[in-house]
Amino acid sequence: MSSESSTGPEMSATTKQMLARVRQMVPPMLEKFHKGQLGRVAVIGGSEDYTGAPYFSAMASARLGADLSHVICTPNAAQVIKTYSPNLMVHPLMRSSPPALSSSDSGSSPSRTKSAPDTDPSQIAAQIIPMLDRLHVLVIGPGLGRDPLMQETCAKVITAAREKGIPMVLDADALLLVTKDPSLIKGYDNAVLTPNVVEFGRLTKALGVDEEVEKAEETAGETAKVEALAKALGGVMVVQKGAKDYLSDGKVTLTVDLKGGLKRSGGQGDTLTGSIATFLGWRRAYLEDLWDHGHKLNKEELIGLAVFGGSAITRECSRLAFAKKGRSLQASDLTDEVHTAFLNLFGEVDAKL
C-alpha cells in the first residue's frame, strides 16, 4: 500500500491556489527568531479517561512547527501524558468533580474530601487564566469529557480568553458548552469550531436552525449547512468535516477537496485541531511582521487560511498514513506524517542564516 504515499496529493486547481496563499503566512526559518515567536499553543483537555486526545492535538501542533506546545489537564491525566513525550509542557491545573459521598461517608475526615480550591471552578480557572498572556492560541476540548467541574472551568477560561482576543479552536466536549450556551463564542470571529456529524447536529438544534440546515443542502447546495450554522453563530468559523471539508464564517466559504485516507479511527480530529492552532500561531507572527512577507494577505482572510491549512495538513496526513497502514491505521500514525504532509503541500520555506 506504500505506492500511493510516494505520489503527490491530488487536488483541484482552486485548492492549489488556496495552498499557495496559505504558504505566504508560513514563517521562513530565520536565525533572528527566538523561542516562542512562531507559536505558543495550549491544549485544554485531558482527563482520567481520555489522555490520548490532548496529546495528539499538542503533538500535531508541535510537529507542524509551533515553538511551544502545552497541555493543561487533570493531575491523573498529566502523569500519563508526561510519559508520552518529553517535548510537551504538561500542567496539572484542571480538576474533576469529587466522587459523591455515600451516607456512610458523611462523617469522613477532611483528608478524604477535596478542598474548596479543588472544587470551585472560579478558583481553578484563576490558576489557568494568568497563563493566557503567554499564549497565542488555545485548543479546548480534546479529552475534556463532560464532568461538570471541568466544563464550568472551561467556560470561565473561554470567557477570559475571548476578552483577551485569543484565537480558540473548540472541539469534542468543549462543543457541549457551546450547545448549552452559544453566547460563549457567538459573534467571536477568533473562534473555530470543528464538530463531527453528531456535534454539528446538536449545534444546529441549539441555535434553532436545525430545520433550516436540514433543507439547506437540497435548496442551496452542499455548503449551505455550514454557512447556516456559521451565520447563526455570528461569524464564528465552522468546519464541516466529511468527504470534503467545508469551512465557513457565514460570509466566505472554502472547500478543501484533498484526498484523505479511508479509515475513520478515533483521534484523527485531534490532528486537525493542533494543526489549525499552529497556523493560527503563524497568523499572529504574520500580523506582527516578524519577517518581510510583502503584506499580500488581508487580515480578514487569515483565519480562513489558517483553518484551510490545518484541514489540508490533516487530510494529507490521513492519506499518507492510510497508504502505509490501511485498515490498521491509528491516530498516532497521522502524528508521524505531519512533517511529510507539510513538505508535500507547501515545501520548505528557504532557511536564511
From Swiss-Prot:
Protein residues bound to ATP: 241-245, 260-269
- Record-annotated YjeF C-terminal domain positions: 18-345
Chain segments carrying region Disordered: 95-121
Cofactor dependence is on: Mg(2+)
Q: Where is the composition biased (Low complexity)?
A: 96-114
Entries under PROSITE patterns matching the protein: YJEF_C_2 (PS01050), YJEF_C_3 (PS51383)
> Is the keyword Cell inner membrane in the record?
no
- Tell me any Pfam family this protein matches: Carb_kinase
GO terms, molecular function? ATP binding; ATP-dependent NAD(P)H-hydrate dehydratase activity
* Gene Ontology CC terms: cytoplasm
| Chief location bin | cytoplasm
Give the family this protein belongs to, as stated in its UniProt record. Answer: Belongs to the NnrD/CARKD family.
Record's function text: Catalyzes the dehydration of the S-form of NAD(P)HX at the expense of ATP, which is converted to ADP. Together with NAD(P)HX epimerase, which catalyzes the epimerization of the S- and R-forms, the enzyme allows the repair of both epimers of NAD(P)HX, a damaged form of NAD(P)H that is a result of enzymatic or heat-dependent hydration.
This chain's protein is named ATP-dependent (S)-NAD(P)H-hydrate dehydratase
Origin organism lineage: Eukaryota, Fungi, Dikarya, Ascomycota, Pezizomycotina
